[in-house]
Amino acid sequence: MTSTNEPIPTEEEIKNGFKFIQDEICKFLITTTGGHQQYSEDKWDYTKGSGGGISRVWEGKEEEGFYLNQDYQSQNNKCDKIEKGGVNFSYIVGSNLPSAAATQFKIAPDTKYIATGVSLVIHPYNPNVPTIHMNVRYFEAGDVWWFGGGVDLTPVYPKLDQVVEFHSTLKKVCDQYGQEENKTSYALGKAECDSYFFLPHRGETRGVGGLFFDHLKSDKAKTWKFIYQLGLSFIDLYKPFLVNNSSISYDKVQREYQLYRRSRYVEFNLLFDRGTKFGILSEGRTESILMSLPAVCKWKYNYKPEENTPEANLLTFLRPRDWLNENQENKN
C-alpha cells in the first residue's frame, strides 16, 4: 500500500532525516545541561559492508562522593547531569543477514540490505530524573521494508503527574501523525510497549512504558512522517524531567536505590532486548550495541524495599496502567 497524497521518501531522505534527529537531540541535551557537559564523538565505519555511524557519548565524572555532597544542590548548575548517555546514528549496507533473520522475513541469501536509525539512552546522576530510551529505525532488503521505533521511561522516584504528562505528549504525537490503519495509534503502541518492556523473571515492567512499534510496512510516506516526528518529540518528552527534576536534592539512600534499580535495566537489555540480540548475532559494532548500559549498577540478594517508603512506591508503577485516565486526586 502506498500513499497517493505524499511523495514516497527516498533512502537518502530517510538517512538524512535520522541524522537531523540526532543533531537536534544532541543540541537540546547540551543546552539543557548547561552547555558545559559535552559529548565525545566517535565516527565509525561498517567493516562488513559499507556505511557506518556517528556515536555521541556522554560520560560524567566518576566522583561519587561529590554527587552525594550536601552542597550538590547549590552547585547543581555546574555539575554533570548525565552520568552515562549516548545518541547514536547509523547507516549500514550489507548483504549477509543472520540466517535466522533471513528465514523469518523470507529474504533470499546475499540480498542487499540497509539499516539506518537513531538510538539513544540517557542515564542521569540524579535519581529524581528518570532514565529514557528511544529508538527510531528503518530496514530494507530487496522488496521488504519496514519502520520501527519507540520510547520508554524508567523512573526511580516517579511522580504521577509527570508520568501522565509524558503519556499525554506521546498521545498527541500519535493523534497528529499516527493512523489506526498503519498501526501507529497511541493505544496500539502503548500496549506493545507494556508487553515488550516486561521482565518475566521479575514480574514487573522495566518502567512506566511509552510506545513501541515494529515492522510498520503500510503507507511508507505517512509512516516515515510519524517515525520522524516521534524522534523529534524526544525534546518535549524529556525536557520537563531534565529541567525540573535535576535540581531536586537526593541522599545516599536514594542513590543506592537508583543503582539497584539499574540492575533491572541491565537484565532486560542483556536477556530480552531484540536489538541487542540482533546486533550480537549479526556481529554488529559491540561498543554501539552495549552503549545503552549504565556506568554503575548494583545487585542485592533478595532485596525488598520497606513498606510505605518512596522506594516501595515505585513498585506500584511497574505494571501496565491506563495513565491517561488516572485519578489526578491520587497524585504521588
Swiss-Prot record:
Enzyme class: oxidoreductase
Pathway(s) annotated for this protein in UniProt: Porphyrin-containing compound metabolism; protoporphyrin-IX biosynthesis; protoporphyrinogen-IX from coproporphyrinogen-III (O2 route): step 1/1
Record-annotated active site: 133 (proton donor)
Gene Ontology biological process: protoporphyrinogen IX biosynthetic process
GO molecular function, one term: coproporphyrinogen oxidase activity
The reaction(s) this protein catalyses: coproporphyrinogen III + O2 + 2 H(+) = protoporphyrinogen IX + 2 CO2 + 2 H2O
Pfam family, one: Coprogen_oxidas
N-terminal signal peptide: none
Top-rank taxon, per record: Eukaryota
GO cellular component, one term: cytoplasm
EC number: 1.3.3.3
Record keywords, A-Z: Heme biosynthesis, Oxidoreductase, Porphyrin biosynthesis
Binding site for coproporphyrinogen III: 119, 135-137, 284-285
Gene3D superfamilies (UniProt xref): Coproporphyrinogen III oxidase, aerobic
Quaternary structure and partners: Homodimer.
NCBIfam families in the record: PRK05330.1 (NF003727)
Protein family (similarity comment): Belongs to the aerobic coproporphyrinogen-III oxidase family.
Role: Involved in the heme biosynthesis. Catalyzes the aerobic oxidative decarboxylation of propionate groups of rings A and B of coproporphyrinogen-III to yield the vinyl groups in protoporphyrinogen-IX.
Protein's recorded name: Oxygen-dependent coproporphyrinogen-III oxidase
Organism expressing this protein natively: Dictyostelium discoideum
